[in-house]
UniProtKB/Swiss-Prot annotation:
Quaternary context: Homodimer.
HAMAP family: PdxH
Catalytic reaction list: pyridoxamine 5'-phosphate + O2 + H2O = pyridoxal 5'-phosphate + H2O2 + NH4(+); pyridoxine 5'-phosphate + O2 = pyridoxal 5'-phosphate + H2O2
Species per Swiss-Prot/TrEMBL record: Ralstonia pickettii (strain 12J)
Keywords: Flavoprotein, FMN, Oxidoreductase, Pyridoxine biosynthesis
Binding-site residues, FMN: R61, I62, V63, L64, L65, K66, F76, T77, K83, Q105, Q140, S141, W184, R194
Pfam families xrefs: PNP_phzG_C, PNPOx_N
Family statement drawn from the similarity comment of this UniProt entry: Belongs to the pyridoxamine 5'-phosphate oxidase family.
Recorded metabolic or biological pathway in which this protein acts: Cofactor metabolism; pyridoxal 5'-phosphate salvage; pyridoxal 5'-phosphate from pyridoxamine 5'-phosphate: step 1/1; Cofactor metabolism; pyridoxal 5'-phosphate salvage; pyridoxal 5'-phosphate from pyridoxine 5'-phosphate: step 1/1
Record-given protein name: Pyridoxine/pyridoxamine 5'-phosphate oxidase
Molecular-function GO terms, alphabetical: FMN binding; pyridoxamine phosphate oxidase activity
Sequence positions that bind substrate: R8, T9, D10, Y11, K66, Y123, R127, S131, R190, L191, H192
């Protein structure tokens, strides 16, 4: 049986230098994201979202990036879920993208805000019917006795709304407004390249190199 301690990979695909990156962290992220798309990285828009509850207990889960613009990173969820409750109490959060095939990570820290009703409506109505009904049927993070209960709820809302369910008031989008972004490139001998963008009050960014 292989020892977990003996599992290791040496990274050697690429390097990362301040002279080669974009002055804008969001443009740099888009550059890396497009390269991950081209490389056919699985679930390229999957990201770990970390939040903290009022007692200081952190939580993390995978969510999907659904929009990226000059303001930040957008994802959608149930506002009444554990993460929604935690973000209501403390809007500070972090994201992590891990594109293992490219030996890259991107870490993002910032403040989360709800997107507009119009943005939530537009994305909700672009989803498959089953996903739209599921947003009604699932009281996310609450206890349920069995799967049959969920399926019965889905059938109930399908009968009620047909193929035109409205967006539930408890479901919508969040946008993380980045204040720090770290781009990590795996390198040999664990001497990885780490570049961090730090946002200033005037909206400008400073780029620094961090020790691995």
């Amino acid at each position: 049986m292989t020892s977990i301690a003996d599992i290791r990979t040496d990274y050697a695909r690429a390097s990362l230098d301040i002279a080669d990156v974009d002055a804008s962290p969001l443009r740099q992220f888009r550059r890396w994201f497009d390269e991950a798309l081209k490389a056919e990285v699985a679930e390229v828009n999957a990201m770990t979202l970390a939040t903290v509850d009022p007692h200081g207990q952190p939580s993390a889960r995978i969510v999907l990036l659904k929009n990226l613009d000059e303001r930040g990173f957008t994802f959608f969820t149930n506002y009444a879920s554990h993460k929604g409750e935690e973000l209501a109490a403390n809007p500070r959060a972090a994201l992590l993208f891990h594109w293992i095939g490219l030996e890259r990570q991107v870490r993002v820290q910032g403040i989360v805000e709800k997107v507009s009703e119009a943005e939530s409506d537009a994305y909700y109505h672009s989803r498959p019917l089953g996903s739209r009904l599921g947003a009604w049927a699932s009281e996310q993070s609450s206890e349920v006795p069995d799967r049959a209960t969920l399926e019965a709820r889905e059938a109930e809302y399908r009968q009620r709304f047909g193929d035109a369910p409205p967006r539930p008031p408890h479901w919508g989008g969040y946008r993380l407004l980045p204040e720090r972004l770290e781009f990590w490139q795996g390198r040999p001998s664990r001497l990885h390249d780490r570049l961090e963008y730090r946002k200033h009050a005037d909206g400008s960014w400073t780029i620094v190199r961090l020790a691995p």
